[in-house]
């Protein structure tokens, strides 16, 4: 499966409630209908931000983004052909007037599940996106991340067993602004991933432990820049198909 992922920050002149209402009540149903009738879109997923106010976690997960939008396809060819249909579509499909173009970004990649959540246990998901470490080419970084890093992670049950979901998205630089300007600006982030856990406390515990810092974190730093990532935390996912 392939996925267009869009980290969306709203236009500052629009309230979060108004932005999410337009996104969920108007845009997402229209986009799902159009993408399936005119293209090969499988589904639209809108993830809503978890309210972390009063939890002490806002400093860890600052509310930079207001929503995460996912457009799912069977192949890169399906994605490219369908996105071209959106680019020439009607005004109701446009979201660019409602977002902050200086912050919002999207990218396209192949989804590679490493620990699927078949039982739907992920009450909370964290989606991240980042860049490869200097000195690595993207293909080699993708290969190491896919083949070696999950093996390393499984050596740390304090992290691996707490996660109900871990999937990688290997993004490819095969689209540009001309295909996604109706949604938000395109910016290439080679690597993105979804991690899930039943609760935010369990998700934090998966990464806030000595074994993660001693074993997994150094491996992440070999091929990527985990200190410089986009992050979005959600406890509500809405699917439109």
Where would I find each of the regions flagged by the language model?
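Macromolecular interaction modules
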Residues: 1-241
């Amino acid at each position: 499966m392939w996925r267009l992922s869009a980290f969306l920050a709203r236009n500052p002149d629009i309230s979060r409630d108004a932005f999410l209402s337009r996104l969920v009540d108007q845009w997402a149903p229209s986009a799902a209908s159009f993408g399936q009738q005119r293209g090969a879109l499988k589904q639209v997923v809108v993830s809503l931000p978890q309210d972390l106010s009063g939890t002490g976690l806002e400093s860890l997960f600052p509310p930079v983004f207001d929503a995460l939008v996912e457009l799912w396809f069977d192949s890169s060819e399906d994605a490219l052909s369908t996105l071209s249909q959106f680019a020439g579509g009607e005004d109701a499909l446009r979201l660019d007037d409602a977002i902050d173009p200086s912050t919002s970004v999207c990218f396209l990649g192949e989804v590679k599940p490493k620990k699927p959540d078949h039982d739907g246990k992920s009450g909370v998901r964290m989606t991240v996106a980042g860049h490869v470490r200097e000195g690595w080419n993207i293909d080699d970084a993708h290969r190491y991340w896919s083949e070696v890093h999950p093996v390393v992670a499984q050596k740390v049950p304090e992290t691996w067993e707490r996660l109900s979901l871990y999937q990688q998205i290997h993004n490819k630089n095969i689209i540009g602004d001309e295909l996604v300007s109706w949604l938000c600006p395109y910016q290439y982030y080679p690597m993105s991933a979804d991690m899930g856990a039943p609760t935010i406390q369990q998700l934090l515990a998966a990464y806030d432990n000595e074994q993660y810092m001693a074993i997994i974190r150094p491996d992440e730093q070999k091929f990527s820049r985990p200190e410089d990532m986009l992050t979005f935390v959600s406890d509500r996912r809405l699917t439109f198909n």
